[in-house]
Regions:
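Alpha-helix boundary/capping detector
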Residues: 39, 123, 218-222
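N-terminal active-site beta-alpha-beta segment that forms phosphate/nucleotide-binding
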Residues: 1-64
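Conserved phosphate- and dinucleotide-binding cores of soluble alpha/beta proteins
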Residues: 51-212
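Intrinsically disordered, low-complexity segments enriched in small residues
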Residues: 1-21, 25, 158-176, 199-230
């Protein structure tokens, strides 16, 4: 996911987004990208090189080692179009960019209650680039229709990407469908399509995802000694 970040971007990392925080660290520390990071713990530009990943990326330590930026201010930045990237980790994603972090099953009688979307419905369509991540790629998480629409970018014009443990997809607004952008080295087109509950455009345009370097692996292992990313 670090490769999806670019110079000059303001990046918002949400709650329990360990993968997103590590991606930002790799992009900033190793790739030398001039990104600015805002966390849900109200930390602005925390020193990522000095911070081991905790069980919650809402850890106030993130604010202590950086400037405090109240969450309401981050929302104002999104409203003004100044948040370039937001990472979101939904339990379900469907073929229209609808995401679900609310309930599995019906709202009236849910099988599972999820953490909720906070301001996802507000921010998701406003950021210039939304990076969704779900590292349990299956027909249960990438579904034909989410059980509950917590947020959507269906009627927006922003760039929306979906990173899983099998591939990277980008939403094609002209075709109104997800397009396969890259397949991870350990996966295949057949596995991706067979594990996805919605239509995926899988023409000849996709590539093989770059494997992480040894230096990247070492940094990730140092920042996440407890393996919370796994």
């Amino acid at each position: 996911m670090a490769d999806l970040l670019s110079d000059g971007e303001l990046v918002f990392v949400g709650l329990n987004s360990h993968h997103a925080l590590l991606a930002a660290a790799v992009a900033k520390i190793l790739h030398r990208k001039r990104i600015r990071v805002v966390t849900v713990a109200e930390g602005y530009e925390p020193s990522l090189a000095d911070l081991p990943v905790r069980r919650s990326t809402g850890d106030p330590e993130l604010a202590r080692i950086g400037t405090v930026l109240p969450t309401v201010e981050a929302f104002d930045l999104a409203q003004k179009g100044k948040v370039d990237v937001m990472f979101l980790g939904p339990a379900q994603v469907d073929g229209e960019t609808n995401i679900n972090v609310s309930v599995i099953g019906s709202l009236e009688s849910p099988k599972v209650r999820l953490p909720g979307g906070a301001a996802a419905a507000f921010i998701f369509p406003l950021v210039r680039k939304a990076v969704l991540w779900n590292f349990r790629h299956s027909v249960r998480s990438l579904v034909r229709r989410v059980d509950f629409v917590t947020a959507t970018a269906r009627n927006a014009s922003n760039d929306v990407l979906l990173c899983t443990d099998l591939c990277l997809m980008r939403y094609d607004r002209e075709r109104k469908a997800w397009r396969l952008a890259s397949i991870h080295p350990w996966s295949s087109k057949e596995e991706v399509l067979g594990s996805t509950g919605f239509e995926v455009i899988a023409d000849a345009g996709f590539v093989v995802t770059r494997a992480p370097t040894e230096e990247e692996r070492e940094l990730i292992a140092r920042l996440d000694p407890d393996g919370l990313r796994l």
